[in-house]
């Protein structure tokens, strides 16, 4: 049986005043028109996904569709407005800042829209570079 590595359930990120209260007042499922009429900016709306151990995930979509925001919510670089995010069965919304730093350093990797590769390295060597910096044996 495959083990879930990260699970996101009903993740929301709204920008505006007291977005948690707004979601609660609409039973956690306002439609897009209601969100916009109320003056909120929806960055992520009710996103759910599951990534199993050993899987590689690529989020693709139009510019401004919420891909980077969702990944930042998954790693808690920004706080989601609502929803559940579990990593290895642990609730990331309850994790301390220290636990999050360790997670980001050792267990979760991300490549965002604006990145640079080392031109003198192969693609594989670029991908392995963070492990090399940490002293992990690549054999």
Where are the regions a protein language model picked out?
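The feature captures the beta-strand-to-loop junction immediately N-terminal to the Walker
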Residues: 60-62
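Conserved ABC transporter NBD signature motif
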Residues: 83-91
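ABC-family P-loop ATPase nucleotide-binding domain
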Residues: 1-40
